[in-house]
Amino acid sequence: MFTKAMNIADFDNELAQAIADEATRQEDHIELIASENYCSPRVMEAQGSCLTNKYAEGYPRKRYYGGCEYVDIVEELAIARVKMLFAADYANVQPHSGSQANAAVFLALLEPGDTVLGMDLDHGGHLTHGSKVSFSGKTYNSIGYGIDDKGLIDYDAVAQLAEKHRPKMIIAGFSAYSQVLDFQRFREIADSVGAYLMVDMAHVAGLVAAGLYPNPVPFADVVTSTTHKTLRGPRGGIILAKANPTIEKKLNSAIFPGSQGGPLMHVIAAKAVAFKEALEPSFQKYQEQVVENAKTMAKVFIARGYDIVSGGTQNHLMLVSLINKGLTGKAANDALSRAHITVNKNSVPNDPQSPFVTSGIRIGTPAITTRGFGVNEVKKVANWICDVLDDIDNEEVILNVRNKVAELCAEFPVYGQ
């Protein structure tokens, strides 16, 4: 028999210590990884609830297990809220991740060997958009499009690739592109060759929900997303679409039983909480600050002599090329980590370095904005980053920045009292 007094610390000190240390790291370090954020205590409460005990294979009111009357309510709430958030006619909230959501779309709409046109990983795409190390590039014939010399997507070049290769599906989406996608143009290109259009809005879903980035749902056949990142929910995925009974049936079957078994009801509950939070007016103000903070940081980097791929940002992230500084992404990542500033090394277009080394770093503002950083704070942070990178082997500079980071983080706790 269990008691509510049971806790990890009294039973598993090693694990408890690792969790405590991670909590300290999150409070004491500045988090600039573009795909990370802090979810609310409400979201975490749902994830830690008794719903983790319940198996619920199938969909609401059509389960293969008994006792699902309450988890049906949970999933229906999540579905209704996310449909409202993105003006979608269809929603599946069961994908365990964004990659699982993408895999389900491939399974639903394509056959092995079909041609897919997506953004090159080296130019800002995602592994699941056709990378040769992913299922998307191993099971399917993947063709990549990229960015031009100005760091922008060349839609005429995309159209030419589509005409040449006649893909069955075109993917619009990215993991490191700082500009706004033209979904109308992607729709026209897809229609010109009779292709499906899938949009992966994982990185910008929060901006879309707040009306600060174009909504892809009216243009795409299918839209996928994660529920963390800018959406600030639990780690998970969703699939959205306009009304299309044929596609809806294929998508549902591709998730269950096609690629997943029982849904994670505790995570779906957390998604429902996050979707309700995203419907609040305060969420729009948060997203506005995310974008303003990103634009501010980009201007500081440019003023300090650093190259931003595509010349700036129109969303929450930027890709900083270090080629002109003679630095690698790995060296920059390691030095900034010692200063308690967390970024991730990232390949840049035509990168001479390997993916394990890279010539760039990706920076995003969702997490620091959640903890309350505004324009004044992000100016400081951007300048501290430049201070470290300008003298990357100077441990005294790194220590000085780390002390400043500690003071700033203490002023803006992630989880206050």
Curated annotation (Swiss-Prot):
Annotated catalysed reactions: (6R)-5,10-methylene-5,6,7,8-tetrahydrofolate + glycine + H2O = (6S)-5,6,7,8-tetrahydrofolate + L-serine
Pathway(s) where this gene product acts: One-carbon metabolism; tetrahydrofolate interconversion; Amino-acid biosynthesis; glycine biosynthesis; glycine from L-serine: step 1/1
Localization per record: Cytoplasm
EC number: 2.1.2.1
Principal location class: cytoplasm
Site positions (Plays an important role in substrate specificity): 228
One Pfam family this sequence matches: SHMT
UniProt entry tagged with the keyword DNA repair: no
MF terms (GO), sorted A to Z: glycine hydroxymethyltransferase activity; pyridoxal phosphate binding
Annotated residues for binding of (6S)-5,6,7,8-tetrahydrofolate: 121, 125-127, 354-356
N6-(pyridoxal phosphate)lysine carried by residues: 229
GO cellular component term of the entry, any: cytosol
PROSITE patterns per UniProt: SHMT
Cofactor: pyridoxal 5'-phosphate
A biological process term (GO) from this entry: tetrahydrofolate interconversion
Keyword line: Amino-acid biosynthesis, Cytoplasm, One-carbon metabolism, Pyridoxal phosphate, Transferase
Subunit composition and interactions: Homodimer.
Family matches, as NCBIfam families: PRK00011.1
Function according to Swiss-Prot or TrEMBL: Catalyzes the reversible interconversion of serine and glycine with tetrahydrofolate (THF) serving as the one-carbon carrier. This reaction serves as the major source of one-carbon groups required for the biosynthesis of purines, thymidylate, methionine, and other important biomolecules. Also exhibits THF-independent aldolase activity toward beta-hydroxyamino acids, producing glycine and aldehydes, via a retro-aldol mechanism.
Family of this protein: Belongs to the SHMT family.
Protein name as annotated: Serine hydroxymethyltransferase
